[in-house]
């Protein structure tokens, strides 16, 4: 692959993860902000639809193929919330810490065995803005919500997401360890295999 793709995100954590995961491939990932693309509101009802909105917007502005991600945290005890509202769970201008505080408050009376959750990620790839057959790849990462924060790495809800297999929070893992088991890592591995067959 000798390609340049625009990544339809301004999230520095996601950009770093994607660039790290693709470093062994001859692919240049250009963050959309570097090409003058602004973020658009995530107005759809599902992760997949939101990712497609973002990818189409980036394609239309840049003329480049686009990769877009939509992801979030789904907590069983909260009927799948925060879900598509993960980034703005505590309000439209919420910080990651605001979101974590709200989540922990809502789970304060929930026993540890009922705090199961998963990170979900969908990655979509559009060859051009009118691509009728976008590549859509999904990944999940199963875990438990901790009662307090652990670790200083990562971003978002990572400090309160416990991986029972790794016996660590997502924020205690190195980026290499995280990419090996994360929702985004799983989705990107699928996307890479599909791209290798189609480009």
Cite the ranges covered by each PLM segment.
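Anionic-ligand binding patches
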Residues: 2-6, 12-199
């Amino acid at each position: 692959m000798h390609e340049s793709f625009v990544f339809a995100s301004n999230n520095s954590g996601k950009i770093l993860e994607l660039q790290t995961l693709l470093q062994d491939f001859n692919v240049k990932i250009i963050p959309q902000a570097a090409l003058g693309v602004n973020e658009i509101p995530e107005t759809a009802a599902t992760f997949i639809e939101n990712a497609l909105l973002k990818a189409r917007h980036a394609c239309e502005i840049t003329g480049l193929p686009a990769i877009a991600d939509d992801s979030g945290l789904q907590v069983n005890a909260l009927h799948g919330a925060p879900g598509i509202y993960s980034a703005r769970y505590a309000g439209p201008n919420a910080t990651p810490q605001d979101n974590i505080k709200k989540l922990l408050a809502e789970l304060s009376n929930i026993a540890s065995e009922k705090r199961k959750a998963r990170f979900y990620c969908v990655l979509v790839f559009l060859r051009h803005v009118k691509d009728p057959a976008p590549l859509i790849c999904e990944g999940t990462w199963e875990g438990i919500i901790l009662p307090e924060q652990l670790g200083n790495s990562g971003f978002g809800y990572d400090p309160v997401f416990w991986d029972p297999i790794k016996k660590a929070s997502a924020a205690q893992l190195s980026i290499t360890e995280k990419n090996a088991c994360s929702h985004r890592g799983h989705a990107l591995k699928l996307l890479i295999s599909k791209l290798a067959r189609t480009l």
